[in-house]
């Protein structure tokens, strides 16, 4: 190839590249044109560069100089086209935009107050050596009632006070549970079912808490809801007394509600504890009931295979919502389950 032919090819390549870059309507088209002319492997400039070897030796300096000049010109044309597509120097800038102002921080999620309370309770009880135990929310009557010393005729087993599940079917496809009868399963009405399952599997000493949902068909109002959370505590060992129970609850109350909180026991009755007490905390000058407690009834120990002559223990149950509401000054339990972000964002 002669020098004139080589120079003519370079001039034509530069002209074609200028036209392609100028006519590119968007970044994708401009990039396609760049690859066509400046591509490292198959670009047209690369192809012409390979022809330099066929130029006479005496003409190679002039051909090389022209090649470099055209390459620089094509690169400059590409950069100009790129700048034009992006709006130039300042022509596309919004005059009202101030880059020195801080950006808008995206909204962050909030942990639900019940979840916060459960985490706090778990931390407090964990410092006293209590481990978390879990159990199913769908239970059978033995774990929910029988093993807890609740007899068959006890009003707590009434279908009007529990969510029995009509899951058993007869061959005709109808439910085998008649109106007014207990079903083979129910939504647990208390987290005490977990202590039965743990004691059936583990030998003393035991020190556990169970936090979870329980279900009772209560009409929703400011203090009642069909589903709520309980914290059940269980300690089984030798020589456990009411003094141990009161100490644990006092330490818990001081950690959760403050050092100035006092505690008192009022005599009560629960089938699964004997003696049984209601637990009140003196908080902000008012005695407030938070739950029930007591020494585990020997019949409960017998149901799980423990010898009540060798071991003793206590159990307590506290309402998580009640603790949460008192701590945060919430007056209506329904607010916790309303899904109203205006309320939940406060926590």
UniProtKB/Swiss-Prot annotation:
Signal peptide positions on this chain: none
Cofactor, free-text remark: Binds 2 magnesium ions per tetramer.
Domain of life: Bacteria
Gene3D superfamilies linked: Bira Bifunctional Protein, Domain 2
Disulfide bonds: none
GO biological process entries: phenylalanyl-tRNA aminoacylation
Reaction catalysis annotation: tRNA(Phe) + L-phenylalanine + ATP = L-phenylalanyl-tRNA(Phe) + AMP + diphosphate + H(+)
PANTHER family listed in its UniProt record: PHENYLALANINE--TRNA LIGASE, MITOCHONDRIAL, PHENYLALANYL-TRNA SYNTHETASE
NCBIfam families per UniProt: pheS
Protein name, entry field: Phenylalanine--tRNA ligase alpha subunit
Species whose genome carries this gene: Rhodopirellula baltica (strain DSM 10527 / NCIMB 13988 / SH1)
Gene this chain is encoded by: pheS
């Amino acid at each position: 190839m002669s020098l004139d032919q080589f120079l003519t090819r370079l001039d034509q390549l530069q002209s074609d590249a200028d036209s392609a870059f100028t006519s590119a309507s968007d970044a994708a088209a401009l990039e396609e044109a760049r690859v066509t002319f400046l591509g490292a492997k198959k670009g047209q400039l690369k192809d012409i560069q390979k022809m330099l070897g066929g130029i006479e030796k005496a003409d190679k300096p002039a051909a090389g100089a022209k090649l470099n000049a055209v390459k620089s010109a094509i690169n400059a044309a590409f950069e100009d086209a790129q700048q034009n597509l992006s709006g130039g120097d300042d022509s596309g800038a919004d005059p009202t935009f101030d880059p020195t102002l801080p950006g808008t921080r995206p909204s962050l999620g909030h942990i639900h107050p019940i979840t916060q309370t459960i985490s706090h309770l778990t931390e407090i009880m964990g410092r006293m050596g209590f481990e978390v135990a879990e159990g199913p929310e769908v239970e059978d009557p033995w774990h929910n009632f029988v093993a807890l010393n609740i007899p068959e005729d006890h009003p707590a087993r009434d279908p009007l006070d529990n969510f029995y599940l009509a899951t058993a079917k007869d061959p005709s496809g109808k439910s085998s549970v008649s109106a007014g009868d207990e079903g083979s399963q129910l939504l647990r009405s208390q987290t005490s079912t977990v202590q039965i399952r743990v004691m059936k599997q583990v030998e003393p000493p035991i020190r556990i808490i169970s936090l979870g949902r329980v279900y009772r068909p209560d009409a929703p109002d400011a203090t009642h809801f069909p589903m709520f959370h309980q914290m059940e505590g269980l300690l089984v060992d030798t020589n456990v007394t009411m003094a141990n129970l009161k100490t644990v609850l006092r330490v818990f109350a001081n950690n959760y509600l403050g050092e100035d909180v006092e505690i008192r026991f009022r005599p009560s009755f629960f089938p699964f504890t004997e003696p049984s007490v209601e637990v009140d905390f003196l908080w902000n000058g008012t005695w407030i009931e938070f739950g029930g407690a007591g020494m585990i009834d020997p019949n409960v120990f017998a149901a799980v295979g423990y010898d009540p002559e060798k071991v003793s223990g206590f159990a307590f149950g506290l309402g998580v919502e009640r603790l949460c509401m008192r701590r945060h000054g919430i007056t209506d339990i329904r607010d916790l389950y309303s899904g109203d972000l205006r309320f939940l964002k406060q926590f």
